[in-house]
Regions:
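Catalytic cores of Mg2+-dependent Asp-rich isoprenoid enzymes
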Residues: 1-152, 156-246
Length: 246
């Protein structure tokens, strides 16, 4: 697997949940996250749009051409082969990331918000489920729902940061933030129904990730208004809260 652990660096809530996975499974989940993070970082870095498009095209070409000199590419293809992951899921992820490589991003409807959330996060939940040996259709749908729920949490948390990057996924007022958290709750609830289908050795880790990430939404709601929300900076779950939620 890749030398740099992006999961530990960028996704501390997920990394905490990953602590409860078997070591080999954690490595596979980490390799998946590495691939998604490297792709996403291209859209998020400070280069010009032209440079970002060139870098993203090169990354996609490396994937399509199976450039195994890049460990990130080799690892994702190993996961695809081992877990029977459809490349359509990867292409859906690419579509989501590509939609962020613009001078300005603006989503106008709930449908657009949910499509975007599926592409950049529901896909990841689906691939993660395949790694965790989940194969029933309803269970895979629950994995997509959990990914969407977490992305809606991200969007609700990062309104100011996204605006500074010329991205408007939801309007900048607390009512919209609150309604997005409420929408995420529907997806968190729907993600729970098939949890029993996850193999027992993996189940606790997914429950922890779900509880810890959901907690972010509750903390956002506790800000009560947009002024408090703006003053709070990036809202996260601290280590003590993670232990409590676990």
């Amino acid at each position: 697997m890749s030398a740099k652990n992006y999961l530990a660096t960028y996704a501390k809530s997920f990394n905490w949940a990953g602590f409860f996975l078997p070591k080999d499974t954690y490595k596979k989940c980490s390799a998946l996250y590495d691939f998604c993070r490297v792709a996403d970082n291209i859209a998020d870095d400070e280069n010009t749009i032209t440079v970002k498009k060139e870098k993203f095209k090169k990354f996609k070409d490396n994937f399509e051409n199976k450039n195994f000199t890049d460990p990130i590419i080799k690892n994702i293809w190993d996961l695809i082969y081992e877990n029977n992951i459809s490349t359509k899921i990867i292409h859906d992820l690419f579509d989501g990331i590509n939609s962020d490589i613009k001078e300005q991003v603006k989503l106008n409807t709930k449908k657009e918000l949910l499509i975007y959330s599926y592409r950049v996060a529901g896909t990841v939940g689906l691939m993660m489920a395949k790694i965790l040996k989940v194969d029933k259709k309803n269970s895979l749908k629950s994995a997509i729902n959990l990914g969407i729920a977490m992305q809606l949490t991200n969007i609700s948390r990062d309104v100011i940061e996204d605006l500074n990057n010329n991205r408007i996924y939801i309007d900048q007022n607390f009512e919209n933030i609150k309604s997005t958290i409420q929408l995420s709750e529907e997806f968190y609830e729907n993600s729970f129904y098939s949890i029993k289908e996850i193999p027992l050795s993996f189940r606790f880790s997914i429950l922890v990730a779900r509880r810890v990430y959901r907690k972010i939404g509750y903390k956002i709601l506790n800000k009560k208004n947009f002024e408090n929300y703006k003053k709070s900076g990036k809202i996260y779950v601290n280590n003590t809260e993670k232990i409590v939620e676990t």
